Amino acid sequence: HEATALVGFSQGGIMSLAASLQEANLCGRVMGFGSRFVELPVQAPETVTYHLFHGKSDNVIHYGFAVSAAERLVAIDADVTADVLPYIGHEIHPNMIDLAIERLTTHMPKRFYKQVQEADPGDSPVRH
């Protein structure tokens, strides 16, 4: 599941976001384009990273939903990136695709940082 990303645009993104909250270990990442949570989550799986992409000129699903979702995810200590792109409407724009590829290839999930912080230094394979 860790290598699986659910990707959705608009209603498909809404379904992907909802599925990640309903099914444990379904995926490691959710990429929502021009989408939103049906209801803002009260908790989120530690194993999921949320990547939200939204056009600021979206007249179907307002970009404020992405901002509110990101704020809530941060508040509940979930792993999230959020990108609101100016002059882009309700579409999967090439700039969003570029950002999605960048997020998939460069973003280190928060859970990995936590694992490193919680690791016992005596367990290190490096010997001095």
Task: Indicate residue ranges for each PLM-predicted region.
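Short helix-terminating capping/connector loops at secondary-structure junctions
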Residues: 1-2, 112
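Short, proline-enriched alpha-helix->beta-strand connector loops that line the catalytic pocket
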Residues: 2, 45-50, 76-79
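Primarily recognizes the serine-hydrolase "nucleophile elbow" in alpha/beta-hydrolase
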Residues: 3-47
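Alpha-helical and His/Cys-centered functional microenvironments
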Residues: 15, 58, 94
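Active-site-proximal beta-strand/loop segments in catalytic clefts of secreted hydrolases
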Residues: 33, 55, 85
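A short beta-to-alpha transition loop/helix N-cap that caps and shapes the active-site region
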Residues: 37-42, 60, 92-93
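Short beta-strand/loop motif that positions the catalytic acidic residue
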Residues: 51-54, 58
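C-terminal catalytic histidine-bearing segment of alpha/beta-hydrolase fold enzymes
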Residues: 64-128
